[in-house]
Design a protein with these regions (language model features):
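A short glycine-rich, His/Asp/Glu-containing loop-to-beta-strand
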Residues: 2-32, 90
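Short beta-strand segments in beta-sandwich/barrel cores
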Residues: 24, 33-34, 50-55
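Glycine- and acidic-residue-biased ligand/ion/polar-headgroup-sensing regions
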Residues: 41-52
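A cytosolic small-molecule/anion-sensing beta-strand core signal
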Residues: 48-49, 64-65, 83
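Short acidic-glycine-tyrosine-enriched beta hairpin
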Residues: 57-73
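Ligand-binding loop in jelly-roll beta-barrel domains
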Residues: 73-95
Length: 95
């Protein structure tokens, strides 16, 4: 099955999901915050439009298109959009 991120305009929409993986397309507007949370899965965040402050526990990164963030399970993190932004979040159970 083929998906295009152009087809997704909602804030967060799962575009693929099975027992071991979830792929989510995420739109966040400038100044919007996604509060601190964690997950039991490994996470890869790929930003392809905009600019986001990504906070991982006590570290803060500004991410832009071309940047990739990788997180191990259980790591608390949050996001704040500097500009309107689009990201792909891939959560995988690597056990």
């Amino acid at each position: 099955m083929k998906y295009s991120v152009k087809d997704f305009d909602e804030k967060a929409q799962n575009i693929y999901q099975n027992d071991n993986q979830v792929v989510t397309h995420l739109n966040i507007k400038a100044d919007q915050i996604i509060p601190t949370h964690d997950t039991s899965m490994s996470v890869v965040v790929v930003i392809y439009e905009g600019e986001v402050i990504f906070t991982e526990e006590d570290k803060e990164f500004t991410i832009k298109p071309g940047d990739i963030i990788q997180l191990d399970p259980g790591i608390a993190h949050s996001l704040k959009a500097i500009k309107d932004s689009k990201l792909m979040v891939i959560k995988s159970d690597l056990k």
